[in-house]
Amino acid sequence: MSSRSRGAGALVALVALFTAGYLAPYLLPTVVGRLSAGLGLTPAQAGLVGSVLLLGSSSAGFALAARGERIGPRRAARAGLLAMLVGYGSAAATGTVPLVVAGAVLGGLGSGTATAVAAAGIAGRPDPHRASALGLLSVSATAGALYLTLPHLGGGHAPPLLAIACAAALVWPVTGRLPGGTRARARTNAMTGPLPYRRAGAVLAGGILCWSLAQNALWGVSGRIGLTQAGLSEVTVGAVFAVALGAGLAGVTAAGALGSRLGRAGPIGAGTVVIAGCVLLSSAAGDLLSFATGEILWNAVYPVVLSYLLGLAASLDPRGRWAVLVGSASSLGVACGPVTGSLLSEGVGYPGMGTVLCALLLLVAAPMTAVARHVSGRPLVPGSIRRRGGAPAAVLAGTASATPSLVPQVGAPEQPVAPIRIPAVAGRRRLAKSMFGLAGVRGRG
């Protein structure tokens, strides 16, 4: 098999794994709503179960940040998919709340493992931003189809959990295209070194934690806003979510086509401000028009900004360590979102919750944009490789005509320049530095 075929197969496996791992957060509103209706839980209790599920997901990501390469991508991916299958399947099969919670935690650990493996693999791709966009495109399409299908599969808490378990089973066969443990260990030994961009990475991780928390606090109660405050039926709410995720598909497609042409700072900063406005609109929705407008516009912009954030994290370290850590911080924010949204909505109502979340988003927009401006270097140009030490050679003054896809970007490994010793030639004068110019030897002995 050619190297191009192997690379395409690995990309397919990573996108499929990303889809399975991210499916639980995308289905969070219907999972929380059905836990509340099917098991007789209060909104806060159902939100807490959703938070516990996603907390397990983020914990797995943090645990694998330093050990994933030693285990091997294929083995770690299969372990995560097996945990998803057993955890979500067992939670769907029982109506006992403690067993449902235990199954959700196990399934969340599996989702986090799958997402961490996919994030590390995407960070090692030649164009991590477009690989992230493909993953978001796939998970948005899958979740949109499920939002149209699940209302017709009966009530209870089981259908969405079974859907996630089935996704894990369907992805299992393509994990054979991922590298095994031996190759992963060889890659780990070949690429060692301290974690780069520590300050920028820490700011980005903290910012994306709050960014994800704010949005998933609303996402976790969006179903209840549509059902209770806007007075819509479950079928109508599901249709709105499906259309919203369809708008997300269009947004991710556009982001993938644009790539890094717009930079990262602009889409991250401006996109977060737009999202903050959508959060205000959705939380105050009282009818179908305002609810649908807020949700559709929000879901169209959210995956675009997320793809740039994930691409930024991947560019910080070619080994994928920052990609996994930032992704896990995002999962931690997602995990805290449902219970935060439930507590805020019960305390100050949905509009008050939206105001608080909007303010939080505006606060974190500035530091994340600053990180994007600071570390998103311009393309490498000829003659600018540093001879020894320091930051990667990609942090250089670029030209507008440089082709980004053909030159290293920020985070790429530095290309070492080795000195070459020229031995003295017998019977001739010893070579001296003054004998050489830009075009070669200027004199002869």
Placement of each model-derived feature along the sequence:
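Structural signature of the two symmetry-related core transmembrane helices
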Residues: 75-90, 266-281, 355-358
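C-terminal transmembrane helical hairpin of 12-TM major facilitator-type secondary transporters
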Residues: 262-309
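Cytoplasmic helix-loop-helix junction between adjacent transmembrane helices
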Residues: 103-138
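Helix-loop-helix hairpin linking two adjacent transmembrane segments in secondary transporters
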Residues: 97, 125-180
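Helix-to-loop junctions at the C-terminal end of transmembrane segments
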Residues: 59-75, 123, 250-264, 345
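Intracellular juxtamembrane helix-capping segments at the cytosolic ends
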Residues: 112-126, 303-318
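Short amphipathic helix-loop junctions that connect adjacent transmembrane helices
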Residues: 29-45, 220-236, 282, 311
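A late C-terminal transmembrane helix in Major Facilitator Superfamily
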Residues: 18, 316-358
